[in-house]
Amino acid sequence: MIRYKGFILFLLLMLIGCEQREELISNLSQRQANEIISVLERHNITARKVDGGKQGISVQVEKGTFASAVDLMRMYDLPNPERVDISQMFPTDSLVSSPRAEKARLYSAIEQRLEQSLVSIGGVISAKIHVSYDLEEKNISSKPMHISVIAIYDSPKESELLVSNIKRFLKNTFSDVKYENISVILTPKEEYVYTNVQPVKEVKSEFLTNEVIYLFLGMAVLVVILLVWAFKTGWFKRNKI
C-alpha cells in the first residue's frame, strides 16, 4: 500500500510540475541551436533543445518567457546563417554560367564570409556588408570599389576603435579598395528589458482548455492505479463488490 501511495504521489508531482513550453524556432543546426540557447541563458531564460531528426533541432522555452526570447533573437540577429563554403557555391557538376554570373556569385559568397568574420571582432553582434563590384568586361575601364558596412555593436565606449578595426580589416582584405571608400555605420544594440508574462491561453472550446485536459489525465491515471491496487490486494472480494 505504501508503495502505491508513493507512486501516486510521484505521478501527481510530475503533473503539477509539468511546465508548459512553446517552440521558439525549429529546423536548426547544432551550432545554431547552441548559439541561441547561450544567448537566452545569459539573459536568465531557460531553454532546451529538441532533436527532430531530419527536420533539424528546435529550441523550446517556457510560455511566460516566449516574448522576451523572440526579442533577444531579433536583437542578436539569430539564428546566424550557416558558414559559407566557396566550393559549395561553385560545385564541379553545375552548369556553366556566364562570367558575369560567376563573378556575382563569388562576390556574394565573399560578402557572407566577411560578415561572419566581422562577428569575431569584439563588440560586434552582427554585420551586413555590401561590396560594389564591377561586372563590366575587362576592356572597359573599371570603377573604383566601394564597401559599406552596417554593424550592430555592444560596446558604445569603443565605437571609434571599432570603426577603425573594421576598416583596417576590410582594407587588408581587398587590395584594390581605398580606405576612404569604406564606410561603416554602427548601430547600438537595443536595451533589453526582461519580462516574464503569463502565457496567452488558447481556448480550444468552452471546456477543452489545457488545465481541464491535465486534470482529466491525472484523474484517469489515479483511477487506473487504484483499480490495479484494488484487484491485487483483494479489496473488491473483502467488500463483496
UniProtKB/Swiss-Prot annotation:
Lipid moiety-binding region (S-diacylglycerol cysteine): C18
Main location as per UniProt: membrane
Subcellular location: Cell outer membrane
Presence of the UniProt keyword Glycosyltransferase in the record: no
InterPro entries: AMP-bd_C_sf, FliF_N_dom, T3SS_SctJ, YscJ/FliF
Protein name: Lipoprotein MxiJ
Membrane topology: Lipid-anchor
This protein's GO CC annotations: cell outer membrane
UniProt KW Transport keyword: yes
Role of this protein: Involved in the secretion of the Ipa antigens.
Similarity remark: Belongs to the YscJ lipoprotein family.
GO biological process: protein secretion
Keywords tagged on the record: Cell outer membrane, Lipoprotein, Membrane, Palmitate, Plasmid, Protein transport, Signal, Transport, Virulence
Leader sequence residues: 1-17
Lipid-modified sites (N-palmitoyl cysteine): C18
Domain of life from the UniProt record: Bacteria
